[in-house]
């Protein structure tokens, strides 16, 4: 009975994609995505299909077996529900591989970098370009994680419009989602096999069976959340610090909690985790600026509303934090919001404006000069922690 129950739960997490979804998946995999080079390096014109096939082939030639390849994140959500409110930001690909030692991590990195040579324009002398040079030219982010529960690496290829191509090589990972709506993964192997073997174009009456999986556990429930813009999760204590930023992003896109009481607990968890993972103000500033750049690249007018929502959540749900440090973070968010308004040279909707300035009593003094002297931007340099343990 236990085995049957486990099988039922496993089956609930999978679903077969319909033709509309397969068609959108085909569009995502065959769309040309520019990878922008730094300096004088040329732009690479790639498709996800080509980069996956190239990297997979080279990995297996190097002795690293790829168990499967999956489309993850907002791109997978876009395939399942076209107008879901999340858009299609980074193009996340997951390669399931074994990474038992440092040698495999290094080999994976070298294979990906060398694969980029295939996409350089004709006429470029590839013999003089080393993997290190390619990394400096085209890699936005390079991450390696090795812990008791997580063994994975990430190579993010640069796109100036925020649509980075992210190649993630996973041996093990404890948690692969934050909310039900971002828990989807689409297994690409059957479609990749179709591209390799079929002489006929893909069509409604001639296409492979493609399987999607929800890491949330219940595919239909998560799919309903995505269709109806609902916020739900499981084991919120496992969500890392970036979950607070993702949660605020969902709110600004008109997603709403499935359970208001549970969400209040979730907000407290996420705020606490944010301050644990990003303990000083400089780290918080870098994280926020990077998040805005990556997730609002083509949505400048949403940045202010996003920061106001984030500020409200931090203000209302932060616990285990010294008052001064809490105010410091709130001031940081406020300054970023004001900078956004200055950059856009716009006046926000008055109903959404929050005033952070009240004239001091001495301003009414007749001898007070209101002449403003410009100073360099305020920077935060305190390296001390901004959180206290809960007792």
From Swiss-Prot:
Location within or outside the cell: Nucleus; Cytoplasm; Cytoplasm, Cytoskeleton, Microtubule organizing center, Centrosome
Keywords: Cytoplasm, Cytoskeleton, Nucleotidyltransferase, Nucleus, RNA-binding, Transferase
UniProt main location, coarse: nucleus
EC numbers: 2.7.7.19
Catalytic activity line of the entry: RNA(n) + ATP = RNA(n)-3'-adenine ribonucleotide + diphosphate
GO molecular function, one term: RNA binding
One GO cellular component, as annotated: nucleus
Domain of life of the native organism: Eukaryota
Pfam family, one: NTP_transf_7
KW Nucleus (keyword) present: yes
GO terms classed as biological process: mRNA stabilization; negative regulation of cell differentiation
UniProt similarity note: Belongs to the TENT family.
PANTHER family listed in its UniProt record: PRION-LIKE- Q/N-RICH -DOMAIN-BEARING PROTEIN PROTEIN 44, TERMINAL NUCLEOTIDYLTRANSFERASE 5C
Binding partners and assembly: Interacts with BCCIP and PABPC1; the interaction has no effect on TENT5C poly(A) polymerase function. Interacts with PLK4; this interaction leads to the TENT5C recruitment into the centrosome.
Function: Catalyzes the transfer of one adenosine molecule from an ATP to an mRNA poly(A) tail bearing a 3'-OH terminal group and enhances mRNA stability and gene expression. Can also elongate RNA oligos ending with uridine molecule, provided that the sequence is adenosine-rich. Mainly targets mRNAs encoding endoplasmic reticulum-targeted protein.
Protein name (database record): Terminal nucleotidyltransferase 5C
Species name: Macaca fascicularis
Gene (name only): TENT5C
């Amino acid at each position: 009975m236990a085995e049957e129950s486990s099988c039922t739960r496993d089956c609930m997490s999978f679903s077969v994609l319909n033709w509309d979804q397969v068609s959108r998946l085909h569009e995502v995999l065959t769309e040309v995505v520019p990878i922008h080079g730094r300096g004088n390096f040329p732009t690479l014109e790639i498709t996800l299909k080509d980069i996956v096939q190239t990297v997979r082939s080279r990995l297996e030639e190097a002795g690293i077996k790829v168990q499967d390849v999956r489309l993850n994140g907002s791109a997978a959500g876009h395939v399942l529900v076209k107008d879901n409110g999340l858009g299609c930001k980074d193009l996340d690909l997951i390669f399931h591989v074994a990474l038992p030692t440092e040698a495999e991590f290094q080999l994976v990195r070298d294979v990906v970098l060398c694969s980029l040579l295939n996409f350089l324009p004709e006429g470029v002398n590839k013999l003089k370009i080393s993997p290190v040079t390619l990394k400096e030219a085209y890699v936005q982010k390079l991450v390696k994680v090795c812990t008791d529960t997580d063994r994975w690496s990430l190579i993010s290829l640069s796109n100036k419009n925020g649509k980075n191509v992210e190649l993630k090589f996973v041996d093990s990972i404890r948690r692969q989602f934050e909310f039900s709506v971002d828990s989807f993964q689409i297994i690409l192997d059957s479609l990749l096999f179709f591209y390799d073997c079929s002489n006929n174009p893909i069509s409604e009456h001639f296409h492979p069976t493609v399987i999607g999986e929800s890491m949330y556990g219940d595919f239909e429930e998560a799919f309903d959340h995505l269709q109806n813009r609902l916020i739900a999760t499981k084991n919120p204590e496992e969500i890392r610090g970036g979950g607070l930023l993702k949660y605020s992003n969902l709110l600004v896109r008109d997603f709403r909690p499935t359970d208001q009481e549970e969400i209040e607990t979730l907000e407290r968890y996420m705020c606490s985790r944010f301050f644990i993972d990003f303990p000083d103000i400089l780290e918080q500033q870098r994280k926020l600026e990077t998040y805005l750049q990556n997730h609002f690249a083509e949505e400048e007018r949403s940045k202010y509303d996003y920061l106001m929502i984030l500020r409200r959540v931090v203000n209302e749900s932060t616990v285990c934090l010294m008052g001064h440090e809490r105010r410091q973070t709130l001031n940081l968010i406020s300054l970023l919001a004001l900078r956004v308004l200055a950059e856009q040279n716009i006046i926000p909707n008055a109903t959404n404006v929050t005033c952070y300035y009240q004239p001091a009593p001495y301003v009414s003094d007749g001898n007070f000069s209101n002449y403003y002297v410009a100073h360099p931007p305020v920077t935060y340099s305190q390296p001390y922690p901004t959180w206290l343990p809960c007792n």
